[in-house]
Structure formats: C-alpha cells, structure tokens
Amino acid sequence: MDLRPNAHDNIRVWDFYTIAKSLLHFNKLPWRDVMISGWGLSATGNKLSKSKSNGGTLTPHQAYEKYSADVTRYWASNASLGKDVYIKDEEFNNGFKLMQKLWNASRFVLSFLEGYTPKEVELLPMDAWIISCYKQTYSRFMSALEKYEMGLALNEVEKLFWNFCDNYIEIAKNRLYKPEVYGEHAKESAQYASSTVLLGLLKLLSIYMPHITEEIYQDTFAKIEDCTSIHTSKYLDLGEYTGHDIAFGNEVCEIVSIIRGYKSQNNLSLKTGLTEVVITGCSQFVKDCEIDIKAVCNIQKITYLEGEKNVEILGVVAE
C-alpha cells in the first residue's frame, strides 16, 4: 500500500502502532507515505463533534443538504495538509459560485459544438495562449497531487478556470458568434481551444466536483471520447508547457481590462464603441491579436506607437 490518510491526532496512535506491528510481524513498512489532514473546526475553535454542540456551526451533513455534495467536497479539498480549517459559509458560497459558473460557462461553450468534429487547426494567438495556460496548469496540478496537496492542486485549476471565463471566453466569443464577420477559420480555432480547455478543466475538477462534471461531460464529451464516464477517462495531457506566449497573452488581457475599466469609470456600457485607441510599447503578439481586441472592446481603429507602455482612448462613438 502506498498511502495512509488520517488526521494529526492519530500520528502517535494509529500510525505508530501500525508501523511497529508491521515491522514486528512482516519486517517491512506498511505504506510509503502518510497523508496528514487537519480537523474541521467550529466557530469556537473546537473540533467538530457528532455528540456535542458545535456552537451553531454548519456541519458537513448540513452543508451537504444546503449546498450539495460537490460543494462540500470542494470545501474539504481546500484545506492544506496538516492544518485545521474553520467551517465558514463563505467557503461554501465560493464553491457554490464556482459550480454555477462552471455550469454556465460549459453551456456557452457546448452551444457552439453542435455538429463540430474536434480537429487540430492552426490556432490564432489568443487560442494558443489559453492552450499554453492549460499546459502550465496541468503541470502544476500533477506536481501538487504527487505531494498529496489537494488544496494547492485545486487552487491552480481555479485560477485557470476564472482566467478562461473572465478573459479568454470574453475575448474569443465574437469569433464564435460571427463567423461571417471573422471567418470560419477564426471560429474553428476558438471552437478547438474552448472545447479542449473546457474538457481538460472538467477532468481536473472531477475529483473535487464529481457530480456536476459528470453531468456536463455526458452532454457532449462522452460521445466524442467514446467513454462511459469522466471518472474512467484519462486526464487531458496536451504535452510539455513551453511558456513562450503566456506573458504575451496576459498583456492582451491587461489592455482589454484597461479599456473596459475606462468605460466603467466613465459610466459607459461595455458595448459602447470607441473611435480610436492608441496602444504604446506593446509586443507584436498584441498587434497580432488586433481582431480580438477590436471585437471585445468595440474599437474602430487601433494605432500603435513605440515608447513606454500606455493605452489611451481618443474618442467615443456618439450614440
């Protein structure tokens, strides 16, 4: 056996006795590793008890009833090895929001996959960027799991998921909606990247949220992969992460964020058109992403200048 999981209160009892008896009877260690967890604590700082009052703290069973089994697993998985964790509604709410966003983002991506046959295409820059982000996350995820750091692994997946939703989907969605404007190849590139990363995310999240990931997987991906369950499928390994384009893609996201921030600060709708934006000191990657930047920010003209990095909005389209 490779692993013995238990809490820190069992180190000098269960762990010691098992090791001693195994050496005595079999002259070998019973397992290679021990995974030490902490306790779930009530609001008073005491270990949760089945028989004693927990001071009104939400119990795991109540959490299951209120938030679902997936959210309860999410909360439990967030704990660091060997450390106690307070049971707070805030953490369960975070898990519930993640589950809702996962469902909605999946519905969006899957809505563009009807009749779609997955195939590798020459990716547009931001599509290649999100694939590289996935490769980086996958590498960090597997490294954390090898150390039994379930919480760190989950944190890596969450960062990618919110990047995927808040940045990538927002930037690429116009190419999915309007192939007649941006071209079929631009749509196919976005289809490949969005569906591939979503599938990878579902698989990485499946050990934390097994029910909702299975539900989404069965909708489309089970047929594509010819697999009965996400839990019998393999993780999606897209190859070695090289890291050459992640910083450039992040630069695009930062520019989009600045322009959207300008609109918000000036009480403008995100759909409000801009006559011209001047981007100074950007990379060639940003220039190659002009089609996406114009689309997501509704810009008529982008001018590029040399010099210190800066983004300047020169005019707003009159309504």
Label each region the model flagged.
Residues S77-N78, T137:
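A glycine-rich, basic-preceded beta-loop-alpha segment at the flavin cofactor/substrate interface
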Residues G82-K83:
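Transmembrane helix-loop junctions at the membrane interface of multipass transporters and ion channels
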Residues D15-F16, Y217:
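Active-site-flanking alpha-helical
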Residues T18, N78-A79, T220:
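Alpha-helix boundary/capping residues
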Residues F16-L24:
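Short Ser/Thr-interspersed hydrophobic loop/turn segments at strand-loop and sheet-helix junctions
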Residues M1-D9:
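A short glycine/serine-rich beta->alpha loop
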Residues L24-A69, Y86-E319:
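Feature 926 captures the class I aminoacyl-tRNA synthetase adenylation module centered on the KMSKS loop
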Residues H8-W14, A63-S77:
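Aromatic-rich carbohydrate-recognition surfaces in CAZymes
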